[in-house]
Amino acid sequence: LGGTLSDREKRQLAARDMINKLNNDISGLSRVVMGESSRLESLKNITERYDGYGNSIRKVMEQKDRYKGIVGVVADIIKTQKQYETAIETALGGTIQNIVTDNEETAKGLIAFLKQNKFGRATFLPLSAISGRDIRVDSSLTRENGAVGFANQLVECDSEFTELARYLLGRILVVDNIDNALAIARRHNHSLRIVTLEGDMLS
């Protein structure tokens, strides 16, 4: 009888060990499932957030965890008040969808990623390539009749992106309406890039 009880105890211990192992496996799988669900939710959010963008831009933004040097698209970095939105969007043009990176190496890696996977092309703006660029403008232009200011003066961004805003918008004068814009353009022999609050562009 003692031997029988010992065998039974062994079987119970083995069964208990098996149950514990299965529970551990289930916990591990649950963590994996939760991790994948979180990742899928993150990818879904990126897809929805960049719905109006090209496929290549969405694919790059999905790599943000892998490439820490991805800063974001210009539209996420440079903001402006409602009354200037049309003018700033026009001034930025296609660059509004450019992808900002910390440096050229990150941009190079992402270009290779797009090529290898045949995801198309994207335009990158490495902050390291913009840093220190001298952008000279005639500040007296802001005193012209109807002038609102240079476009980079009408946007908001974190201080680390001030040079980016100046690089993209620092040479574009925002003017209140087309009549004043034409008058300023004529006075300066059409040598300026001007955008009106309604989005008319002169260059």
Predicted region positions:
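Extended, EK/Q-rich alpha-helical coiled-coil segments that serve as long dimerization/scaffolding arms
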Residues: 1-51
